[in-house]
Amino acid sequence: MRNKKRQLNYLLVIILLLVISIGYAVLSTNLNIVGSGTINNPTWNIHWENVQVKTGSVSATTPTIDTAKTTVNYSVTFTIPGEYFEFTVDAVNAGTIDGMVSVVSNKLNGTEITTLPNYLEYKVSYEDGIDIAPNHLLAANSSEKYKVHVGYKKDISSTDIPSSPQTLNLSFSVTYVQSDSNAVKPSHPESFETDSWQTIVTAVQNNYTSVYNVGDTKTIDMGTLGTHTLRIANKSTPAECFTTGFSQTACGFVLEFVDIIESKIVSSVATNIGGWSATELRTYLNSTFLDRLPLELKNGIKDTYTVGGYGPAEGETLSITIDKIYLLNYKEVANYTGSIDTSNSYTRQLDFYSSSGVTTSNPEGAGKKYNGTDMWWWLRSAHATKNVMFTGVASSGGISSGYSYTAGGVSPAFRIG
């Protein structure tokens, strides 16, 4: 431990050069017109402008744009793991000719980057996290906001911390040329309903979700389970989500199924001992069910700290699990505070149900359908006073319960990011 503390004092000095190259040669060839005619003074003007440093960044040499407006220079020194520096800068096409990305280059100490040191975070992307790629269009009289992030990783072991001061030269270069038929618009977030899962996941990871609203829906093909609808059930992360032991099931970007996907038992054993953690349904959802999701979506699903209520058997305690897929509890649906569920104080109501006015006295909005017919559906908490039951939601939306070995509706949720 003593060695680790000493190593924390070593510096990372980052010197970064951000370059925008202009494809003049391509343009001069294309505009080499012989004979009579008129060219209405087309202009080619792509450059950097509008540097903005993110709040929370460490002190650094303020990024500056050179007089040609094609290079951004800055340097930063990190002394403690967890420090970072981030800024945005606009790539502006102020001309009358559409441009597109031709070449993207990222170098560390003069060598194209394939891997980074274990202690270093570094990425240049569009502001929403989408990678900058060849053929991306930059239309005339438009701009794209680039984001530069560099940091000293926080969650690293003492062996990953450099044993001496490090000076790292990072350079990013993008070359724009006149656009042609290969030009495509970058896949920025536009609509939860129509965006690809990769675009959605990337947007959530970069906290760029303003175009996605609670209640927005998107259809998903579940193979043999048919086509179903997902909705955004939550976007907020209030202070209570950071409380030790607080379930993360209603914190962050949560998606839930609008309808009931299938009818299944919770467990083939007539007991709720062990709670959610011991159920066959949990195992199924986090294996077979998970594998039915599209790969781009599956890869973006986060591990979720999940708290479930316990039953009346002696020695029972809260069920604590780490899940990809989970069931809700009734607090998350109707802000329930009753005695049937012992985990109420460890979670919160989802944004969707809160904004829809769903409560225990107004539960209709919690009802769900299975193949078009109203049906009750399972929740994850064991019934607090009946040792063979788990909680559920009645077809009317009110709280209910069922024997662990009887079939009920399954309408799970998960988080992405």
Predicted features by range, described:
Residues 183-417:
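Collagenous Gly-X-Y triple-helix signature in extracellular proteins
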Residues 29, 79-108, 138-183:
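C-terminal, structured domain-capping segment
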Residues 34, 71, 86, 117-119, ...:
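Surface-exposed or flexible loop/turn and strand-edge residues in extracellular/cell-surface modules
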Residues 74-77, 132-138:
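Beta-strand-rich interaction surfaces with strong enrichment in secreted/lumenal proteins
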Residues 112-115, 160-164, 245-246, 402-404:
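Short consensus segments that form the blades of beta-propeller domains
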Residues 40-67, 105-133:
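A surface/secretory-pathway sequence property marking extracellular, secreted
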Residues 2-70, 77, 162-183:
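Short, polar/proline-rich extracytoplasmic segments that appear immediately after membrane translocation
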